Amino acid sequence: HDGYNTDSTDEVLPLGIYPEINVSYEKTNANASPAIYFDSYGHAVVPLLGGIAIRDLNAEETKTLGYFSPKQHDGGGYVIQSSYTFLDSENRIVCPTSNNHVLMLRATDEAGNVLPEFEKVLDIDIKAAAEAALGKELTQNLLSVVFDYDGNLWFATGGFRIYPEREQQGVLGYIAHSAIEAILNGEQADLSKAVFVYGLALGEGAENGIAASKDGAVILTNQNCYLLRAEEGVDVVWCTPYESVGAKVSGEGDKTTGGGLAWGGGCSPSLTPDLVMFTDNADPVKLLALDMKTGEIVASMPVLDDLPEGYQVAVENSAIVYDDSEGTVSTIVCNWFGAGSAGLADPDSDSSIQSYANIYDTNWLTKGNCMIAPGVERVDTVKTDSGYEMKSIWSRNDLSDTSILKLSTATGYIY
């Protein structure tokens, strides 16, 4: 798991010289898997029918080797939320659920063999524990989770679009490492002494994944960016507000029918040892660099601001961030506007439900990337004697993509 959310790797990826393309046909899921994670044995971990599975993606027809189904194995009533699922250092699958629990699943034995039925080794009702700690009802659902460098499990409530005027109550918080270890060892844990929360202002909530470094957990809500630390409670090291014009939707004359996802910045924060990088949701959208120690905005500049007429900008995936350790941080941002469902604006919509029908624009689902706005740009943030400065290195208005781009530093290619 890339806790920095850099979306970059030092691994050698395909060079595109005499490439061989392998195809595996999906005949079980209604859609091809929207996310693929790999464990240390090279197994592909993917969403499957509301659950999670290890599947053979090299077979001519995709085959399931082992899986966990909430319906078959746990009484049903919920689905795995795959967007912010990850694997921990022991190859356990850590996943938030649609009923506000976090699960940890053991998918392989000690030798790396896939278990036909994954073993649930941890199940915590985060919303109930957070409500008990806060002393009031939460009106937002669990969105994302991540471990910090001390093994505490941080969580954030929210959804893919949180409207401030709806005044929902949300929290940021963590489950202490000691409680998680106790549960994994088969012991009882007193969650009243192990779950700590920070109550957000009404209408504030997370819309993204969480990043973690040795400095703490970095969480971006629809209005602020936070650095938080676990100190027998949630220590807010800093809180930095940023700009947003609100949820963006297609208008008269636009070449798209969908919109963006987030009300605020849709770019999960990405980290370097010194900086926090993300985009706001202003008009034009700006890339921001915050000082990791203080939260001060040390550099910013508009991105994707030279698109053809009829296109808007919404950055909804984490950016690629590469720190060369010599004073230059390269960031690559990609436009996503057009893929978001217009139905997210409905007053009774729940943007925490991660399903194709709930999140995505029908025309994008059926017609593909011609229904999203183009735009990919590289911006370098350079350390100078007086601070930092940003400069655009290149911009491509002929590319449209909704997948999370990846960088191989070994090849210098973006995938």
Regions found by a protein language model. Name each.
Residues 108, 167-182, 224-227, 287-295, ...:
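Beta-propeller blade signature
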Residues 51-53, 99-103, 159-164, 224-226, ...:
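Short glycine/acidic-enriched loop and turn motifs that connect beta-strands
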Residues 5-22, 67-76, 119-137, 186-203, ...:
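Surface-exposed loop and turn segments in beta-propeller and other repeat-based domains
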Residues 64-87, 96-150, 156-162, 167-169, ...:
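Asp-box/WD-like beta-propeller blade repeats and closely related beta-sheet repeat scaffolds
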Residues 26-37, 72-87, 129-146, 202-212, ...:
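Repeated scaffold domains used in trafficking and secretory/extracellular systems
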Residues 210-324:
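Long, internal scaffold/assembly segments composed of regular secondary structure
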Residues 32, 275-280, 285, 317-415:
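Loop/turn-rich, solvent-exposed surfaces of beta-rich toroidal or solenoidal domains
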Residues 1-52, 81-83:
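Beta-strand-rich domains and repeat architectures in extracellular enzymes and scaffolds
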